[in-house]
From Swiss-Prot:
Main location: virion
Record protein name field: Protein Vpx
Compartments reported by the entry: Virion; Host nucleus
Role of this protein: Plays a role in nuclear translocation of the viral pre-integration complex (PIC), thus is required for the virus to infect non-dividing cells. Targets specific host proteins for degradation by the 26S proteasome. Acts by associating with the cellular CUL4A-DDB1 E3 ligase complex through direct interaction with host VPRPB/DCAF-1. This change in the E3 ligase substrate specificity results in the degradation of host SAMHD1. In turn, SAMHD1 depletion allows viral replication in host myeloid cells by preventing SAMHD1-mediated hydrolysis of intracellular dNTPs necessary for reverse transcription.
Family: Belongs to the lentivirus VPX protein family.
GO biological process: one example: viral life cycle
GO cellular component: host cell nucleus; virion component
Organism, scientific name: Human immunodeficiency virus type 2 subtype A (isolate SBLISY) (HIV-2)
Disulfide feature: none
Residue ranges, annotated region (Disordered): 92-112
Motif Nuclear localization signal in this chain: 65-72
Amino acid sequence: MTNPRETIPPGNSGEETIEEAFDWLDRTVEAINREAVNHLPRELIFQVWQRSWRYWHDEQGMSRSYTKYRYLCLMQKAVFMHFKKGCTCRGEGHGPGGWRSGPPPPPPPGLV
């Protein structure tokens, strides 16, 4: 995953469109998922996605993009805390499925 500080989110120059902002959000969510799956259990990623969707989209009535944004914030915090606690898997990762043995569950819907 590239350094997130190097990525300037859309909207800072005033020339971006809403569609570009949504594309940026989708790319960033996919990138954090690709990194997180190497460090966190797939069940955790799946549950955070499902619960974010259920709460923000279904219960609160927020848009899809807002739900993805809230999910992105949670996953960034989870990956940050994992690294802060001394992750030694920066190069190789924990392998597919994080710490779980056996076949991995399906990835979050729409984020394959």
